[in-house]
Amino acid sequence: TLPPVTGGATLKSALHDIIDGHSAVSYTPGVWNALVVLDEDATNTANVLLIYGGDSRAKSLQDNGTNSANYWNREHLWPVSRGMNSDTGTLGGRDLHHIFASDKDVNARRANLPFDEVSGGSTDPEAPLSRYTSSAYEPRDADKGRIARA
């Protein structure tokens, strides 16, 4: 907990003491290992819950580079191509605050589209409450808060 402080250098020092000693995870396997814990389905601990669709998917169906359907992968809410350092070995590229388990096909459709309200557009087949156009992606309402806080 944060002790009572008046601000300035004292506050900065107190915050530093709280976060000092954190551990950075590797992109592979670190982020994968974290997602199976962070996005675990509380009703079926062998599965992860996927962002955008809310589906529960077996942890064992982690994308291994195949073209198989039903696999899940790592969705970066802030796309690497939109200003994140493209080196996933950097801290930004593996920041667990904005990486979630996602259906690999949904992730591919979202690509690097910005989040926005979408009227019309297409319904995502694997995430039917999410919609997209060629210029924007609107996640289902149940995920908007998570995304906003990421």
Q: What do these predicted ranges mean?
A:
Residues 58-62:
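Short, solvent-exposed loop/turn elements at domain surfaces
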Residues 1-57:
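N-terminal module-boundary/linker segments of secreted carbohydrate-active enzymes
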Residues 64-150:
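Domain-level detector of nuclease and nuclease-like folds
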